[in-house]
């Protein structure tokens, strides 16, 4: 626009000059009309021309000034169009270079604490218009750059220690290491002290270690007497390094003067817990080794934030449980040490505030910790996620139980009236029915061609976790089956929850089993119940049967109490292909202990079934377990919920029936469909605890 403005002014000046010269030339007939002979009077025409040209000159001058200013403003803002991710959020390292626009001269808007009883309504209001008010609130936060200096971080010797050039610790809050002899600036690490809700320096927010800063990282952990490390990034995301692996996979490794030995590693569906024994390797050191726990949250997606805050809340509780009261600051890091790190710290602090004051003040707390480390909580989506986590915590609280308290809890549930005039168990289940069914995420299942493949049109998979089949050449919609991936206790997508096959979907069923390498099928319905078809018989009674490119041959059929165990030899042969046939053994566990109406009378049969399935999985490699009843929700959800709950009881001595079922309902609608089925989950857990000693082989 800039070249345009001088050109415009030049042409205007030329026009003005030409107009002035016209007074000295003889006008033509087409220019003038006169009733008198001779030239016109210049005194009458010149003022008229001036009055016409002056407004035009003023207008052009204003336009030129506007375009010049607009051009300058555009230069001041980084063009981020090429850096946008699919959900519109900039990735951490990209955002770090975005220039901040100047604040409104009227000053930042004030946001007040929110009483917890108003939290749900406030979130609803802020979420309207695509979270417009959340964005406004987030954009009103101070950046934190103005309040501090960064002299140490910007020293030439320290620049290579920073993962990102403009994510730096303030001088007044940086973690200071002991100075190493002969090494200038060896007291520097990109890490900052961060306060908790009431506790000063409760956390250390750090960047993910680089290869050249790993030694400094462990030196910091030792010198600060930290017993807990919280890791909120994966080592690589989208093929880019986010954090250097600063621990050995097994055995011991020495980082600088700190020896780190792996003591234990427990992998769960949302996070991994590693235990390290660390000890300084100095000639005159006689200090005792220390135990350090690393809790690595693995469910933060490459883009945006977790789909639900449930996993983060469970993770945060585990951090609180494992961190000793006498220990130094909790070390929290992601990649840059501001976005996910800040989100975690704010949720922790606001949960403490709920306990203490029954209110939250997210805006004030984020503003405060940004004075300690700039850009903490890096995106408006992370900021919104904090509120969602706090609402989840307020609405549902902590429903986790120790196994020793289960019996007392059940007595409370069955005997306590609520303000809804229902017993506690019914009220707990009522909360589950409030989990919203996300119909906007069911587009594929609601296509006309796919609706014909559903037994119950209300029970179809969400798009984000549906099981996808290979597309048949030239045949639309052949990648669809009414089946959802469901997380297990230790492994994501451990189950495939599906309906009982229909006659025209049985080929898709076997394609799913084959393509996803499922060696285990759990069937929780009869082929017919109450004279109604519940499931097409998708296996042969004897010999073999072929569905599409897959042949199923029955090899054995045995009945053990209430479970039929059938072994199938499954053969895949692609027509016209030169490759050899592929074969695989698949075992079906057909549970006959579920009555046509209601629930099983006792839990032992379900415990036996889960134990048998787990044993089969250990022998075949833990590929997805195919689970179905008729619609793929009620009994299917109950089996999966109990599998996850009992696995946790064995591993941790803890259970959370409510959150286990709630998590399933977020992955497939109507999982654990009735109050009876929900109560049955509690009953089976109680039976399992009572007879636990008889099931040592369950492990």
From Swiss-Prot:
Entries under InterPro entries matching the protein: Prot-tyrosine_phosphatase-like (IPR029021), Protein-Tyr_Phosphatase (IPR050348), PTP_cat (IPR000242), Tyr_Pase_AS (IPR016130), Tyr_Pase_cat (IPR003595), Tyr_Pase_dom (IPR000387), Tyr_Pase_rcpt_a/e-type (IPR016336)
An example Gene Ontology biological process: negative regulation of insulin receptor signaling pathway
PROSITE patterns to which the protein is assigned, alphabetical: TYR_PHOSPHATASE_1, TYR_PHOSPHATASE_2, TYR_PHOSPHATASE_PTP
Entry superkingdom: Eukaryota
PTM annotation: A catalytically active cytoplasmic form (p65) is produced by proteolytic cleavage of either isoform 1, isoform 2 or isoform 3.
Enzyme class: hydrolase
Free-text tissue specificity from the UniProt record: Isoform 1 is highly expressed in the brain, lung, spleen and testis. Isoform 2 is highly expressed in thymus, spleen and lung. Isoform 1 and isoform 2 are expressed in primary hepatocytes.
Alphabetic keyword roster: Cell membrane, Cytoplasm, Glycoprotein, Hydrolase, Membrane, Phosphoprotein, Protein phosphatase, Repeat, Signal, Transmembrane, Transmembrane helix
SMART domains given in the database record: PTPc (SM00194), PTPc_motif (SM00404)
Extracellular side: 23-47
Residues holding substrate: 302, 334-340, 378
Single Gene Ontology MF annotation: identical protein binding
Stretches in topological domain Cytoplasmic: 69-699
Membrane-spanning residues: 48-68
UniProt-listed PANTHER family: RECEPTOR-TYPE TYROSINE-PROTEIN PHOSPHATASE, RECEPTOR-TYPE TYROSINE-PROTEIN PHOSPHATASE EPSILON
Purpose: Isoform 1 plays a critical role in signaling transduction pathways and phosphoprotein network topology in red blood cells. May play a role in osteoclast formation and function. Acts as a negative regulator of insulin receptor (IR) signaling and is involved in insulin-induced glucose metabolism mainly through direct dephosphorylation and inactivation of IR in hepatocytes and liver. Isoform 2 acts as a negative regulator of insulin receptor (IR) signaling in skeletal muscle. Regulates insulin-induced tyrosine phosphorylation of insulin receptor (IR) and insulin receptor substrate 1 (IRS-1), phosphorylation of protein kinase B and glycogen synthase kinase-3 and insulin induced stimulation of glucose uptake.
Name of the protein described by the UniProt record: Receptor-type tyrosine-protein phosphatase epsilon
